[in-house]
Amino acid sequence: MELDINRTLLVLLGQVYTYIFQVELLRRCDPRVACRFLYRLAANCLTVRYLLKLFLRGFNTQLKFGNTPTVCALHWALCYVKGEGERLFELLQHFKTRFVYGETKDSNCIKDYFVSAFNLKTCQYHHELSLTTYGGYVSSEIQFLHDIENFLKQLNYCYIITSSREALNTLETVTRFMTDTIGSGLIPPVELFDPAHPCAICFEELCITANQGETLHRRLLGCICDHVTKQVRVNVDVDDIIRCLPYIPDVPDIKRQSAVEALRTLQTKTVVNPMGAKNDTFDQTYEIASTMLDSYNVFKPAPRCMYAISELKFWLTSNSTEGPQRTLDVFVDNLDVLNEHEKHAELTAVTVELALFGKTPIHFDRAFSEELGSLDAIDSILVGNRSSSPDSQIEALIKACYAHHLSSPLMRHISNPSHDNEAALRQLLERVGCEDDLTKEASDSATASECDLNDDSSITFAVHGWENLLSKAKIDAAERKRVYLEHLSKRSLTSLGRCIREQRQELEKTLRVNVYGEALLQTFVSMQNGFGARNVFLAKVSQAGCIIDNRIQEAAFDAHRFIRNTLVRHTVDAAMLPALTHKFFELVNGPLFNHDEHRFAQPPNTALFFTVENVGLFPHLKEELAKFMGGVVGSNWLLSPFRGFYCFSGVEGVTFAQRLAWKYIRELVFATTLFTSVFHCGEVRLCRVDRLGKDPRGCTSQPKGIGSSHGPLDGIYLTYEETCPLVAIIQSGETGIDQNTVVIYDSDVFSLLYTLMQRLAPDSTDPAFS
């Protein structure tokens, strides 16, 4: 049943996203054309209203607790498209009144419509978040999706010092931001995400991968996040128009056929070279050399210069075919070719529009063509175009980097070994221009080419002695200089390649089309469910058959003194400290990182590690937290006065509130442990309020005492609420809280333990706790 519901919700979510995409297309169309679809838009707006009314009660119920990413995404998408669809409908009606019905024919009216449709004068992504914790008021400004993710991680760290009412009010503001972003469809605006900020998933991935001697935080500096938003490869086919044109509906066949013929005529006249410009000079030289060589055969004697030309052609041919393709040869496109593609695509679109409609509509990109044309190269690349995929732009950028680096003569020689052979062939052909001096010129050219091709040939010096020594020294110095420059150039090429490989990941993330990932949605749902679980828990326990409220019991003070004075004379066994430390880590952690609840559960300290590391907690605070349970001497773990457990009155500052909360939770852990060992009433289970009915380690058997003999939900629950921090459940049924269940409210640890002792003792007859 649950699987069918999820499938239905996913299908509905897909349909809503399709409608959002259609609204976005309609908003970018010429408003004179979009006004024709007002009736269809109105029908869709009414359908969205019906869906919201149909699901509103279910949304409100599930948003309190047990929310899922699918339900959350569907709710946000419906709320967004309801507002945007109706706003677009009103704008089109207003435009139709002004422009179509003759009030004004100003062309600026179309641009004003686009400014209003896209809210170009205001930024809707800047929000101020405020949160009131037990340690005071904090605020944060959000601009990017990663700001929301960081705030949710900070809220997770402050889970134990924040009331559910304040947290849920803050999450309402976050919900409005998420509705305008994730609810707006699949593709986020470029200005909304910053991939240089790693998320929690990036941090976890780096923790389990090889570090190669680098620290984790140093690796985070070069991390490109692909979880909050995910990049996708987009293939742009320039032949989409001609392939889909014959199947366009609502167009007369004559106009459709004339558009197809006009488009084919345009394609035959316009040829765009996708491979870029080649070296035309060398192609002509190579063609002349081939023509001269083809004029000779085995029956016709050839001069020596022809053999030199043949050898140069041999080396050039062998050099161009052997070996793998170089990196430079892969990046053949350039920015000029991409611009030509864009112009050709625009010309194609205009041709089809004139053939079909007799005029060209003013869409969004044409209305702001002047603004788009004034952009510099970097902004133009970020904006992109319709005819080229982002990967083509990336390849063009990388090719431009290589071309700029290889523009020096030395780098051209290193990257292109056949450059010298090309120059020699060109010079040789120039020297063979005169037929009368062919033999002499061919001999000189062959001699020069043989010297160039055979670098290892021995050089005979006519002068011996000191002149020979000086000449050899000069040659050796020149050779060392050449080798050094070649080595230096190869190192620079290697460094350039490594730099481009490192920067390519960031280029791809920035320029490619991105879609919203599931990381931010899952984080929000986890935090909302974590705080909503408190309200749901208090609502469930209020339905118990027997409720004892020690917060108003007159005899609770005597019970407090009895249990406190009894436990203070005992100490915790040192062998139990590791287990108690893990319990402490489990209770001070937030709901976001729950590695101790996984199928292959990890210790609670692992989950707490991710909590504190993702908020950048100071090292001295992490050390203090790690040694918090081991720093107990005697009875210094006792902290709270009577009915003063989890009281933060007069505390200022988040850090001070956190320390006080740690002390309260440590007191609770030690008190329940000593109570179990002293009074032998069975093990008292300490549970988190957001894990009601969950066994974090997946055990089927419950411990003896609370949790086994009386019911699966029995235990002491820490609610993290100042008004009612402690709730104990006794005798819960198999189905949960029923009329036989006993629930105890308290704000004091020791009076609560006394009540449990009275209830769990087999001969309990004290009427004060009946």
UniProtKB/Swiss-Prot annotation:
> Taking the first listed entry, what is the main subcellular location of this protein, grouped into a coarse class?
host cell
What's one GO MF term for it?
Answer: ATP binding
Instruction: Look up the domain of life of the source.
Output: Viruses
Keywords in alphabetical order: ATP-binding, Host nucleus, Late protein, Metal-binding, Nucleotide-binding, Viral genome packaging, Viral release from host cell, Zinc, Zinc-finger
Q: Kindly list the positions annotated as binding ATP.
A: F675, T676, S677, V678, F679, H680, C681, G682
Is the Cell cycle keyword given for this protein? no
Q: Name one GO cellular component term.
A: host cell nucleus
**A GO BP term, please?**
viral DNA genome packaging
Q: Where in the cell is it found?
A: Host nucleus
Q: Name one Pfam family in it.
A: PRTP
Read off the InterPro entries from this record.
UL28/UL56
Q: Where are the zinc fingers (C3H1-type)?
A: 199-227
Quaternary state and partners of this protein?
Answer: Associates with TRM2 and TRM3 to form the tripartite terminase complex. Interacts with portal protein.
Per the similarity annotation, which family is this?
Belongs to the herpesviridae TRM1 protein family.
Q: What does this protein do?
A: Component of the molecular motor that translocates viral genomic DNA in empty capsid during DNA packaging. Forms a tripartite terminase complex together with TRM2 and TRM3 in the host cytoplasm. Once the complex reaches the host nucleus, it interacts with the capsid portal vertex. This portal forms a ring in which genomic DNA is translocated into the capsid. TRM1 carries an endonuclease activity that plays an important role for the cleavage of concatemeric viral DNA into unit length genomes.
What is this protein called in UniProt? Tripartite terminase subunit 1
- Gene that encodes it: TRM1
